[in-house]
Design a protein with these regions (language model features):
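Boundary at the C-terminal end of the N-terminal hydrophobic targeting segment
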Residues: 25-29
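Non-catalytic cap/lid and distal C-terminal segments of serine-dependent acyl enzymes
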Residues: 59-540
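Contiguous beta-strand segments within globular domains
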Residues: 31-42, 47-55, 207-209, 228
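N-terminal secretory signal peptides that target proteins for export/translocation
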Residues: 1-9
């Protein structure tokens, strides 16, 4: 699930099973397929043949602007897709818009005005990142008074390759001194992991931005507590640099105590790796704790002990940091995880995966399961999100990302899907594997006799009671497990807060982060009694 920016399932954060093209078509096709085609031509400006997933998007209206896909109100835009290989400049491809389509075939669209656009996803990353540099797109095209199946076949041409955009990661609200300080204090960390490289058979990197606190170079003998942060679903290395600037400014202004922040990138074409050891993604937890962290502690003046190593993340990043703390309780001194993805699979965004005849699309009474809400209103169902992701591609969507982390590997080398993408029926064998390996509440209960001594008092979880992705339910269940063990863990439920405004205190949209940082520092420096020079608002 995602952090701070409402974009893709977090979006959720927060979230990858493999389904054949035939299965995708079955999942989203009309019962009696029509034969409505759109023709897309690869423009002559393209010098070489290209391959990828050709995505066609159409929406009602007359405004000529890019047609964007989103998890909120997903059915407002219709999408069709087709894989292409070795597509040569000047050649045309026909997309059968009732074959692989969402929410239904284009032949079902009513007569009206529409804007249509085509995008070639050249790197198979659209489901996670959206449009990327290197993708090729058409201009938005207006279809006036269009009636499906009547008149000439609509035609589009891919004429523009998306170019990289340079964005200033330094806030315009920063002073000149703060901008210079943030620039000098933000360091790239690019570490080749031996264990991940061995798993994948190619060079695999753990990447992060390391933010040094103001005054780091002026105090060469000083060591600092270190926070390991990771983003939510949809995040990436670029966004972490914006976070670094924000953190530096808050430390420089005296809102936060001086600490080193390691802003870890957990994104991949498959979704988020969660820094969990997985038979599909590889040993990310092992690589971080046994390889990357020792390398960082050799390079920077970190406390390099459990009482000075902390974790923070939101959404999918919240699950990752919660997982790391529970799995490696002797390494980390505490996690402050916010709105984590489901930590108890009895409540997987409101669905009990362990129930008899469990189905993620509908409840026992046939009511569709929601997955996104806003102000009490359902914005999307689990079925809609699944079918949308299936059309966009085989990799990287929130739903499939869970499979890549949690599932056993199938005979085809891909993760086994937790549920049937056509019917929604849950596979009990796969869920049993999920439980044994990744249900945090289950693992805590089972392993408490061995991990309790090192874990007690180290879990701090925050979630809104109106979480956009229904993640408060699983938090309550994990809380109940800890209470049953008489553990001293802190769970904070912030009334009426959603996934996206959880950190807001009064007018400060990330004020909660100051509070978290102060509490971390108190663990690392219990005698320091650090106080903000600007008031840190109390928890609500």
């Amino acid at each position: 699930m995602k952090i701070f920016r409402p974009l893709s399932l977090r979006f959720l954060p927060v979230f990858l099973c493999a389904v054949s093209i035939g299965c995708l078509a079955q999942a989203v096709s009309s019962p009696s397929p029509q034969h409505l085609f759109f023709r897309v031509t690869l423009g002559a400006q393209q010098a070489t043949p290209v391959s990828g997933r050709l995505i066609l998007m159409i929406k009602p209206g007359t405004k000529l602007e890019d047609v964007q896909v989103g998890e909120f109100h997903p059915a407002r835009i219709s999408i069709a897709a087709k894989d292409v290989s070795g597509w040569k400049p000047g050649e045309s491809v026909d997309i059968h818009t009732d074959n692989i389509a969402f929410p239904a075939g284009f032949s079902k669209l009513p007569q009206g005005d529409y804007v249509v656009q085509a995008v070639l996803d050249t790197a198979n990353k659209f489901s996670y990142y959206g449009r990327l540099p290197g993708d090729i797109e058409s201009d938005p095209t207006f279809l006036a008074h269009w009636t499906a199946g009547q008149g000439d076949e609509p035609k589009l041409t891919l004429v523009k390759t998306i170019e990289p955009k340079t964005r200033d990661w330094l806030s315009p609200k920063m002073t000149a001194a703060e901008k210079q300080g943030a620039t000098d204090s933000t360091k790239m960390f690019d570490f080749v992991s031996p264990s991940l490289t061995q798993f994948w058979g190619r060079s695999m990197h753990i990447r992060a931005w390391v933010l040094l606190p103001p005054g780091y170079s002026d105090h060469p003998k000083e060591r600092y507590p270190t926070v390991y942060f990771t983003h939510g679903f949809g995040g990436k290395m670029e966004y972490n640099k914006f976070t670094a600037a924000m953190l530096y400014q808050r430390m420089a202004e005296g809102k936060m105590p001086p600490m080193i922040w390691v802003l870890l990138d957990e994104s991949s074409p498959r979704g988020t790796d969660e820094f969990a050891d997985s038979v599909n993604n590889g040993p990310w937890g092992q690589a971080l704790t046994q390889e990357a962290i020792p390398a960082l502690e050799r390079q920077y003046r970190m406390d390099a002990k459990p009482s000075g190593r902390f974790l923070n993340g939101h959404s999918s990043g919240g699950w990752a940091t919660l997982w790391l703390q529970v799995t490696y309780p002797k390494i980390f001194g505490g996690t402050w995880s916010t709105s984590p993805d489901p930590s108890d699979f009895h409540d997987f965004t409101g669905i009990d995966l362990y129930a008899a005849h469990a189905n993620v699309f509908r409840g026992p009474d046939g009511t569709p399961y929601p997955i996104i809400r806003d102000k009490g209103k359902v914005m999307a169902t689990f079925k809609e999100l699944t079918q949308l992701e299936d059309v966009l591609g085989h990799y990287g969507g929130q739903v499939r990302s869970f499979d890549w982390v949690f599932s056993p590997r199938g005979s085809d080398g891909r993760p086994e899907p937790m549920f049937n993408h056509y019917t929604g029926d849950v596979d009990p064998a796969v869920v049993a594997y999920w439980q044994q390996h990744y249900d945090i509440a289950y693992r805590v209960a089972q392993q408490w006799p061995t991990i309790g001594h090192d874990l007690r008092g180290k879990v701090h979880l925050y979630v809104g009671t109106a979480d956009t992705f229904y993640l408060d339910g699983a938090a309550h269940k994990l809380d109940a497990v800890f209470q049953g063990l008489h553990a001293n863990e802190q769970f904070t439920y912030i009334p009426d807060r959603t996934h996206f405004d959880l950190y807001r205190i009064k007018k400060d949209r990330v004020g909660l982060l100051d509070e978290i940082a102060v509490r971390m520092y108190a663990v690392a420096r219990p005698k320091a009694h650090w106080k903000a020079t600007q008031t840190v608002a109390p928890a609500r």
